[in-house]
């Protein structure tokens, strides 16, 4: 059995047609049919239902297909990573969600640059979902995000959980609780500004899920493009917003931050890399994160 047999079989299953699969693979249909027959004979198992239109897998064929696509994906990743390692220019590409710039990420990147003065570091702002695809396609090497998106090709590690705060106008009644804090059910009747508006899932999805977990359903929800816009509107008296605690570094006239007391009112911070990633630069990035976290006094630094 060779990799081409797996690629031929996967193409037939996905196209549900020998003719379309042959066109996709740029080979004639008769040789393709013979290769599939040879594969079945080698396995001693019928993988495709005979005479079905469109082409369908047998139960055994479906099982074989699931593992074939995983194996081919790993092979493609191996080839991509090998070519990247062989590249003359050493570059690491890092994706991040914008709100992390108000926390520890700038310090992590700065210390990492100091540790690797000859390494080219490229930064790309993108959502967690986009980071997942960019990692799989080799467009970035690491991603910092706030959502846990499961993907067998990606290793995602929780760095820490960050508390959520309520951003309010200084004249808002909730600001009277600035020293004590408020709960989610205190916000249910407020006009809430969430961000970003797209693509989903995103931070606004996470916030709405927290409300839902408490059996709460805010009805006055406005979604805006980014955190800076949300906070600017809050400062203008247009509503309130739920933001990570690190966002308090954004200070605007008449903008105030009130603690949110619910234990699960948190937003996680993850780092994501490819599952087979073994670059020394990635391990060095881990070590840089450990140093910053230790300096900040986090009791349980990430353990890779």
UniProtKB/Swiss-Prot annotation:
Cis,cis-muconate binds at residues 99, 128, 203. Coiled coil: none annotated. Residues 1-58 form the HTH lysR-type domain. The keyword Transcription applies. Belongs to the LysR transcriptional regulatory family. Homotetramer; dimer of dimers. The dimers can also associate to form linear, higher oligomers (in vitro). This is HTH-type transcriptional regulator BenM. It comes from Acinetobacter baylyi (strain ATCC 33305 / BD413 / ADP1).
